[in-house]
Amino acid sequence: MATVQAFPMRALPGEQIAATLNQVSKNYGAVQALKNFSLEVRAGELTAVLGPNGAGKTTAIKLLLGLARPTSGRVSVFGGDPTALETHLRVGAMLQVGRVPESLRVHEHIDLFSSYYSQPLAIKQTLAIAGIESLRDRKFGELSGGQKQRVLFALAICGNPDLLFLDEPTVGLDVEARHLLWDEIRQLLTLGKTVVLTTHYLEEADALADRVVVINKGSMIAEGTPQEIKARTAGKKIRCTTRLSVGVLRALAGVVDVQDDRGTMVIHTSRPEDVLRELLNRDLAISGIEVTGAGLEDAFLALTQEKAN
């Protein structure tokens, strides 16, 4: 794996737009995956696209990659058609459905994928950025799930793309490997690359994103910096040890969601004072109470529940 290193802060991104979805709707039969959806991906930024399963994230990515056509509206990448060859030469993608032959060695895969591009990175540089120098001569089929993820990341960047799509890139990685990949993504941003990231790890979006877009039921429900998204909810997170069940806690007024973290209840709430009062009334033996400010996860839960209601 690549050595962890500090990356310099990059200059503030300009207003140049790398890709757009303009009033796009996409229907699959009677199902409307996107409804009058608009999005601007700004050059030099990392845009994180968040949403529950089935929200429309994958459909939006497919449209930007030219893998699907909109039912209505306009899709543009670098001012042109996303299906055009000249567009594909400037785009890299790491998708969840990515599969490659298991019998080829890692360097053979990189060499093959690099041949599709006019100005690819040197294989040595690709291996270094992805932190897989030690896997160079290994067959893909011999690798662990996490190692395969890193090779797929290498294949996404080997063409030296200007626009990079990363769909759940850290799935299967342990915490250390995940943070190393974050550093590698930051390095790409310092080189002026544009990244569109989808992830279920909300701390990942919080750590990496310049802008966050939240989608639910085919519509954009929030857009802004991570700080702006978090500021949209006045919620708090209450941690405590209580005899009350998850079901009882979820039924309390003002509770957005509840998780059982190995016996400690984590309560996301928009009305912390009311919830605390109710907890103390219902469980005199409650202990370990801790109240913290809302994070991106809390804001995400509040926004998506608001849309559902």
Regions found by a protein language model. Give the residues of each.
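ABC transporter nucleotide-binding domain
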Residues: 182-270
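Conserved protein kinase catalytic domain
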Residues: 88-92, 127, 230, 276, ...
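C-terminal coupling/interaction segments
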Residues: 2-7, 270-309
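Solvent-exposed beta-strand sheet faces enriched in polar/charged residues
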Residues: 22, 78, 241, 290-292
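ABC-family P-loop ATPase nucleotide-binding domain
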Residues: 1-25, 306-309
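Short alpha-helical
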Residues: 82, 101, 118-121, 203, ...
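ABC transporter nucleotide-binding domains
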Residues: 16-19, 26-197, 202-203, 207-216
